[in-house]
Amino acid sequence: MNLELLESFGQNYPEEFDGSLDCISLAVTCAFNKYGTLLAVGCNDGRIVIWDFLTRGIAKIISAHVHPVCSLSWTRNGHKLLSASTDNNVCIWDVLTGELEHKYRFPSPVLKVQFDPRNDNRLLVCPMRYAAVLVEVGGTHRCLPLDSDGDLNIVASFDRRGKHIYTGNAKGKILVLDVETFEVVASFRIIVGTSSATAVKSIEFARRGDAFLINTSDRVIRVYDSKEIITLGKDGEPEPIQKLQDLVNKTTWKKCCFSGDGEYICAGSARQHALYIWEKSIGNLVKILHGTKGELLLDVVWHPVRPIIASISSGLVSIWAQNQVENWSAFAPDFKELDENVEYEERESEFDIADEDKSVDLNADAQQDEEIEVDVQKVEPVAAFCSSDEEGEDENALQFLPMAPEVEDPEDGWTGQDGLEPSAVMLGHMEPHDYEDDIMASKRRRMQLYDVSLPDAPTDETHPLISSKASKDKQQPVGGKKAAGRTKK
């Protein structure tokens, strides 16, 4: 898809349901890569399914974890994928080969993981009821400093360029920390009314611009300008650019995100499968997308460069897009569209081989356009894929995964013993089983395991993803024998 040829006028947000992606197992969370060509979906059985979003087909399946995957994050170039599961494990995967490179075991449940937007060797981990942890890949880890009130319900996120980390707690206090020194650059508190504070549930940054949003427990989404926050410094009192909420239903928000260009904000309801879309500049509600009734929303992500939203509910990934209208006049300006059949009247000498009535134009040669050399070798960078501080695209970025055709009836000699390629076994001086052992040994050497020690970390906590499922299973059906029985006195 050539992004330069897409319709850039009119509304830039999805309007209708455009199909679903079935991962066979139940989908829990998802994340787009930077280019929007690959969609990683974390499933309930621990697998990560990577979809080719252009063909809407499965490109790769990684058997990542044993427990459900709760968070995913891509590197900037798309070669690495970060995943966290409900068994307190955080893993870094090579997307091209599907191999595990690094594994971190935490003592407490992990709620969110995120790669540094500009540094593939740095990641942010948010454990449950503990300070956020900044991990250097293959090196050390550091805990982010807490506010003076010592609240441990921390949410954290990198800013767009990875220079600062924004943290928020249950008392509405926001800290802006320098990534290198952990120095508090700015801080402010979200206050409802005159004195009461509200808990911070999530912090999300736009891919373009300096805006970021804070989802709080008072059911209001506040949009701020990061430049203004840093300018005001410590204990500032910034005013939000917009306050977004559902005034009618007082909806609580499960997940919020920006559009690829940062001009729209999407929020998913925590009570039903409904997506609310606002325009950031003026704050008006432009669209509500309704899914199947009775479904609960788990995750929402916006495509990085196109007006497409992916939402997860009932184990399926729902795709929301614009209604595509065919515009044939865009290819032929003189093309005339008809609402009904019309008998065509041939013009005089229209289909003649030689037009006898054509007048001779003496100035035809002079009116011809000058010849222009067209450069077919130089590849111009696509503006949608480049940041404001970049001159061009990353040539080493991974946008697509190679696919191999499945051969139903392979010819003789196509594969060796145990399904191995003949070149791997026949050309070497080893048996097939020795070759398999060599592969397993190299994978073990390549994968590095780390036990992250967090002092006084809560080890008896249950991940919210598991506890919510357990509470649903314990609910008794209405009208059962226990409900119909008489209460004892």
UniProtKB/Swiss-Prot annotation:
Gene Ontology CC terms, in alphabetical order: MLL1/2 complex; MLL3/4 complex; Set1C/COMPASS complex
Localization, UniProt: Nucleus
Signal peptide: none
InterPro entries given in the database record: RBBP5/Swd1 (IPR037850), WD40/YVTN_repeat-like_dom_sf (IPR015943), WD40_repeat_CS (IPR019775), WD40_rpt (IPR001680)
GO biological process assignments: chromatin organization; heart development
Keyword match Nucleus: yes
Residues covered by region (Disordered): 451-489
Ranges for the WD repeats: 22-63, 64-103, 147-187, 195-234, 248-290, 292-330
Keywords: Chromatin regulator, Nucleus, Repeat, Transcription, Transcription regulation, WD repeat
SMART domains (alphabetical): WD40 (SM00320)
Main location: nucleus
Pfam families tied to this protein: WD40 (PF00400)
Subunit structure: Core component of several methyltransferase-containing complexes. Component of the SET1 complex, composed at least of the catalytic subunit Set1, wds/WDR5, Wdr82, Rbbp5, ash2, Cfp1/CXXC1, hcf and Dpy-30L1. Component of the MLL3/4 complex composed at least of the catalytic subunit trr, ash2, Rbbp5, Dpy-30L1, wds, hcf, ptip, Pa1, Utx, Lpt and Ncoa6.
Role of this protein: Component of the SET1 complex that specifically di- and trimethylates 'Lys-4' of histone H3 and of the MLL3/4 complex which also methylates histone H3 'Lys-4'.
The name this protein goes by in its record: Retinoblastoma-binding protein 5 homolog
Organism, scientific name: Drosophila melanogaster
